[in-house]
């Protein structure tokens, strides 16, 4: 697995020093995932000689799940919203800041345009730090989508967008209630290595 720049620990130390002393600093990784009604066929096991078949649909309706994950303790903030843009990203950041209101958060995120827009409202207890370009493998939050697709949205046929949204919401709620599962997916060793 690729590792981020060796400057990350030093960068985090500098950011932590900018926060008031005595406050806990929380490291979060953020990402968005798209879920909808287009079929996503997945493999499955079946006894011989059976050969399972899976239905498919091509309805282009989507919702977007926003998550911010704390690999250190398995805590997560999430929202399901109709699209991705600067305004809704600001809403998500405000919710995350409220959830982690007793901490100062450093949030690592990818380089999506709505993450860098001048109109983005970043809460006072939060600093945003971009991940290197073209490096989804460095973002532990990506594993949340993999988990949801493998465990809850295998070969789906949704009758409407609300059914897809309910399935994603149930899966996110289960992850909220299972910090150890979330931690096991997101606690990459390089995150906790001290600065050399």
Predicted regions: what is each one?
Residues 50-59, 124-143, 157:
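RNase H-like polynucleotidyl transferase catalytic core
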Residues 117-125:
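Short, aromatic/basic amphipathic alpha-helical patches
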Residues 23-27, 142-196:
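C-terminal anion-handling pockets and recognition modules
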Residues 24, 104, 125-128:
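A generic structural signal for alpha->beta connector loops
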Residues 31, 103-115, 139:
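Acidic/histidine-rich, metal-coordinating catalytic segments
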Residues 36-38, 115-117, 137-140:
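Short catalytic/ligand-binding loop motif for oxyanion handling, primarily in non-cytosolic enzymes
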Residues 3-94, 188-193:
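Extended, low-complexity cationic-aromatic segments
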Residues 1-2, 109-111, 129-153, 161-164:
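RNase H-like two-metal-ion nuclease catalytic core shared by retroviral integrases
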